[in-house]
Curated annotation (Swiss-Prot):
SMART domains: S_TKc. It comes from the Eukaryota. Keywords: ATP-binding, Kinase, Nucleotide-binding, Serine/threonine-protein kinase, Transferase. InterPro entries: Kinase-like_dom_sf (IPR011009), Prot_kinase_dom (IPR000719), Protein_kinase_ATP_BS (IPR017441), Ser/Thr_kinase_AS (IPR008271), Ser/Thr_Kinases-Pseudokinases (IPR051681). The active site is at D139 (proton acceptor). This is Serine/threonine-protein kinase mos. Coiled coil: none annotated. Its EC number is 2.7.11.1.
Length: 189
């Protein structure tokens, strides 16, 4: 592990090297208050494990084998999508996790209308692909849209996602209370 990129409700993400490639490693913590929710989050992340799309963060590997000394349910190794999220660009926060290291700096500057259209196209393409695979993200927000060094948006953080069995039987009945309250769709409030 090279350094911490960020942390959230169910774990921490680190920049690392795996078989010579730069990756992001998510360690899903064992939540003592809500063990079921942390387990569900770990397995939900793996909904996209076999998928490959330019606008979706790719899962490289995963393991539930962790040392007993660690308070972890498992580890997920993902492609490294970069230091910057759409949240950083929209709100002008240029550093990850409050660290002022140049290696963690996000230098995207002002978001022009033209760039917003390009980013929107990337996000819609990723969502269309996920929906074609019967996966709903359920926590789509600027902080979960990563911007690569090639200026491509990738949807990440699938800890709240659901894989639908088939579109006819479950497409209209998504009942979900996770995700970020301030970014929920109105029909889920």
């Amino acid at each position: 592990l090279l350094h911490l990129l960020g942390s959230g409700g169910f774990g921490s993400v680190y920049k690392a090297i795996y078989h010579g490639a730069t990756v992001a490693v998510k360690k899903v913590k064992r939540c003592s208050k809500n063990h079921l929710a942390s387990r569900q989050s770990f397995w939900a992340e793996l909904n996209v494990a076999r998928l490959d799309h330019n606008n979706v963060v790719r899962i490289v590997a995963a393991s539930t084998c962790t040392p007993a000394s660690q308070d972890s349910l498992g580890t997920i190794i993902m492609e490294y999508a970069g230091n910057c999220t759409l949240h950083h660009v929209i709100y002008g926060t240029g550093y990850l996790t409050g660290n002022n290291s140049d290696s963690l700096k996000c230098d995207h500057g002002f978001l022009s209308t033209a760039q917003a259209v390009i980013y929107s196209h990337d996000i819609v393409a990723g969502l269309m692909f996920l929906h074609s695979q019967l996966i709903v993200h359920l926590d789509l927000k600027p902080a979960n849209i990563f911007i690569t060094e090639h200026n491509v948006c990738k949807i990440g953080d699938f800890g709240c996602s659901q894989k639908l069995e088939d579109s006819e039987s479950s497409g209209l009945y998504i009942c979900h209370q996770g995700g970020t309250y301030t970014h929920r769709a109105p029909e889920l409030l």
